[in-house]
């Protein structure tokens, strides 16, 4: 059974009042959403790891310096020991969740090896962990004004610097998120 409205391929933009450190000033891409719950990746919280460190830990040699320096994100509080590679869905890299308009999440070693060889997807983001919501939880958080929503834009995912993604996603709505009040509905 599908959810009444699917937020797949949308950004969840954390309101300034959302204090949970996993989502504070966060922009999350919803990758799966149905009646059973939702799954997404936080796109603007860097971890302490780089791609080079992840590849070394997995004994995958040959990463070019630019790839090795690329930051790995904290994708959310669930399964932080597991890597998720968000990329354009141009090739099959083993088990993948395909969603939206040509995006996929792959968790296989194969995609990491392809990236290290230089024949992986040109545009990708790697995250450790993901954000998950139970049945109806995301909808309730949206009703409670924890999130703004907007259709996802590839340029924000792949081309915008990490530290600018929250503002850029809100900018799609034509607002300066830093000027949004933490208090809503009080006269």
Which functions belong to the PLM regions below?
Residues 1-126, 130-187:
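A short aromatic-anchored loop/beta-hairpin motif
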């Amino acid at each position: 059974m599908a959810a009444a409205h699917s937020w797949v391929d949308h950004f969840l933009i954390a309101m300034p009042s959302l204090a949970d450190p996993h989502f504070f000033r966060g922009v999350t891409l919803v990758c799966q959403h149905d009646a059973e719950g939702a799954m997404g990746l936080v796109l603007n919280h860097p971890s302490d790891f780089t791609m080079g460190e992840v590849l070394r830990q997995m004994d995958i040699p040959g990463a070019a310096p630019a790839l090795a320096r690329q930051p790995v994100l904290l994708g959310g509080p669930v399964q932080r020991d597991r890597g998720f590679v968000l990329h354009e869905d141009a090739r099959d890299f083993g088990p993948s969740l395909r969603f939206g308009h040509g995006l996929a999440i792959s968790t296989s070693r194969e995609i990491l090896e392809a990236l290290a060889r230089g024949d992986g997807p040109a545009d990708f983001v790697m995250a450790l962990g993901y954000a998950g919501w139970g049945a109806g939880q995301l909808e309730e958080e949206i009703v409670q004004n924890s999130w703004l929503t907007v259709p996802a834009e590839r340029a924000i995912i792949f081309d915008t610097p990490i530290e600018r993604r929250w503002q850029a996603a809100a900018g799609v709505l034509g607002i300066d998120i830093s000027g949004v009040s933490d208090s809503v509905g009080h006269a």
